[in-house]
């Protein structure tokens, strides 16, 4: 099964006042918590869609299947982020999980359970 993930990392940070995904929490950028929680071994591709160069640079530090994707519509909101991610999926993707980038408490085990349920449903 060719499973993809799209990490939505395009927030404007208006209420926060800056790019909150690069803000540090206990010495680690917020987005790293989300990326580190993704069970990369279960995905064929993990696309991180963003408008921020510093996030693209950070994602470049991660091995495959992580890939940074620059959005062509940075002001288009969440729906534009989703469209950009879907447009960049491999054509043989069997399914896609959408993940918000600003969830530092997300646990790898909960994502593994979600994927297992999805795979069980397909059988």
Each language-model region and where it sits:
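Short glycine-rich anion-binding loops that position phosphate/pyrophosphate groups of nucleotides
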Residues: 11-13, 53, 74, 101-104
